[in-house]
Regions:
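Terminal amphipathic alpha-helical/low-complexity segments used for targeting or macromolecular assembly
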Residues: 69-75, 80-115
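Structural signal for interior beta-strand "rungs" in well-ordered beta-sheet cores
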Residues: 1-78, 82-84
Length: 115
């Protein structure tokens, strides 16, 4: 997960679970939601309690996904409240995978020194 986002849940009401290879943009808030793998959560987006983001999704910057909303796999979500605007293309799916790899490689380089 890329940072600095914020993940939190409401005890007894919701649980936050983030799947593998998810990229979370700066300032995003994940509050008691489930995000399946290989997805991108855009900068400043807000995911509220008990919403479920399917795998291979892109949640656009600033989107608000309301409580309990279920987003199908391979969906592009934009707006407030967030709405599915279209399906993710094969090219975008490759971009999702590439984005995660770049964040991972960048995070691994922190703390390294060439001497």
């Amino acid at each position: 997960m890329a940072s600095p986002g914020f993940a939190h849940d409401t005890a007894g009401m919701s649980t936050t679970r983030i799947g593998p290879r998810v990229t979370v943009g700066h300032g995003a808030i994940l509050h008691g939601c489930i995000v399946e793998g290989d997805s991108i959560i855009g900068m400043g987006s807000i995911l509220l309690d008990n919403c479920v983001i399917g795998e291979h999704c892109i949640i656009g910057a600033g989107a608000l996904v309301p409580m309990g909303r279920v987003i199908p796999p391979r969906s592009m979500v934009l707006g407030s409240p967030g709405k599915v605007v279209r399906s993710i293309s094969d090219t975008e799916l490759e971009w999702i995978k590439y984005s995660w790899t770049i964040y991972k490689e960048t995070s691994m380089s922190y703390g390294r020194s060439d001497g």
